[in-house]
Amino acid sequence: MNARVEQLEFQAEARQLLDLMVHSVYSNKDSFLRELISNASDALDKLRLEAFRNKDLDVDTSDLHIQIEVDKDARTLTIRDNGIGMTRAEVVDLIGTLAKSGTAELRQQLREAKNAQNEAASEELIGQFGIGFYSSFMVADKVELLTRKAGESEATKWESSGEGTYTIESVENAPQGTSVTLHLKPEDTEDELHDYTSEFKIKSLVKKYSDFIAWPIRMEVERRTPATEEGGEETVTREVETLNSMKALWARPKDEVSEEEYKEFYKHIAHAWDDPLEVIAMKAEGTFEYQALLFIPSHAPFDLFNRDAHTGIQLYVKRVFIMGDCDQLMPEYLRFVKGVVDAQDMSLNVSREILQQDRQIKAIRRRLTKKVLSTIKELQSERLDDYRTFWTQFGRVVKEGLLSDFDNQETLVQLCSFASTHSEEEATTLAQYVERMKEGQTQIFYATGETRQQILKSPHLEAFKAKGYEVLLLTDPVDEVWVGTVTEFDGKPLQSIAKGEVDLSAEGEESQAERDEQQKEFADLLAWLKDTLSDHVKEVRLSNRLTDSPACLITDAFGITPALARLYRASGQDIPVGKRILELNPKHPLVTGLRQAHQDRADDPSVAETAELLYGTALLAEGGALDDPARFAEILADRLARTL
């Protein structure tokens, strides 16, 4: 075998995806053409930009286009572009393997979608992971790719039948750009495999999926001219026809663009297979002129929380593509928004570094952000089901904005929804919470934890449930952080049920005299426990938030909770956790029994061991981790043995 010809195996994840394509049961196999045309369009965008920025690049950009060629006899379909092209290494990296991030999650989600025979979910995944090239194997039993990078002399030929391996070789005398040739599977109407050598079929697919592509999509078509004389024969000629209108959707009035056109454009720029949840069309005139077409997706991408994930906004200047992931146009907490911004008064030679300082970009970003947030607000007030879909998919990300976007913090707080003890199914806004507050209640109560069930079983919640106070249940990691930034809503302070002191005695169950008497009765025990547990706690006091549990651990009003400390440590910041406060339920048998035992035999080691067990159970009840699990287990086993 030629030294420059190799047979390689696909990466494991790629083989699984290929298997899904080859044995596809999708009804919508037509969409493979959209994916290949989108890839070709991207290649042309990149070449034009590179040629503008690199004056030494010797390429002809006067006739950039996409060519579709069919061969009915050979049953092949070729999509060709004269764009940027790829090197051999890029072919292996982009086609032989999947993107470096998210491969494990892709493997798991593909398996689940395939096992459930969930066509919609599987199609969505393909677009989500940006691997539409593989969809060629839905309709082809062999795929050939020929590509030459602009400015390079050597070309690369890639070929695979989708069975786990591919061949790659270096070739000479290839045109600049990329061509993908599909050796089509036999037509099968039952399996939705159409005749993709049909001129009518190809034209209809281009019109449906890719009419808005900015580059001409050309194909040689047949023209029939009727006979001019009776008894004569019709004349058949062939000519090249441009199949798409090439109209920029964002430049057209919204009332002239159909819903279907918006959907297909979204799928093109977002590499998505599902429909957007909402379309936002904007046009600004005046100091800064720009047009924007933005989309709120209906599903979160797999890499939503990946720091290296690309943002979804494309920047154009006077309809010339500048960059595909312009993170300066949208705040990070709105990174899920997809779309296009076309500015009129910027230099084509703009760079990311320049954008960071550009006054116009900052102004556009502010306006886009406010428009997206106002659109979400409209969903919340007018289309509640769509808002709930949005919040389920993107709520965790939006809450990040509470920590970073102080200009819009008030709006963001109003947009947020939270689980609460009021309802198992329905989330609540803070405004709705305030409307339901009990008479005399002055604070908005909340609890943080890993899951709803964990919080509901927390000792901290007992008195709040018993007295009918609604508590917000915050289970996202970001919740631990933003509650330290947003301290009040509508004049009502936010109060953690596990921090500081809370007064729930407004109903007058106990008089102050009774509480003073309890304090006197337990004073010796509290002082002894503080000394005995001094390695773990800074204070021991009686609690009015416990009804069933013997004890719970509390953090100072302005202290860092253990969960927040874990979050900081996970991000590389070593935050020390201060000692906490142990609160006791003065009516619990264990606490009253411990008080009596301390009075009777304070020097008995078993009494001190009981104090350790009391502290350990409080720690475990809130989902914490014991400092010395073996010691705790030893004491507990000894106590259990004595009961037998």
Curated annotation (Swiss-Prot):
Matches recorded under CDD domains: HATPase_Hsp90-like (cd16927)
Keyword Cytoplasm: yes
A: annotated segments: 1-352
UniProt keyword Transcription present: no
Keywords: ATP-binding, Chaperone, Cytoplasm, Nucleotide-binding, Stress response
GO MF assignments: ATP binding; ATP hydrolysis activity; ATP-dependent protein folding chaperone; unfolded protein binding
Region named C: 567-644
Subcellular location as annotated: Cytoplasm
Stretches assigned to coiled coil: none
Domain of life: Bacteria
InterPro entries: HATPase_C_sf, HSP90_C, Hsp90_fam, Hsp90_N, Ribosomal_Su5_D2-typ_SF
GO cellular component terms given for this protein: cytoplasm
Entries under PANTHER family matching the protein: HEAT SHOCK PROTEIN 90 FAMILY MEMBER
Subunit architecture: Homodimer.
Function description: Molecular chaperone. Has ATPase activity.
Family designation: Belongs to the heat shock protein 90 family.
Protein name: Chaperone protein HtpG
Source organism of this protein record: Mycolicibacterium paratuberculosis (strain ATCC BAA-968 / K-10)
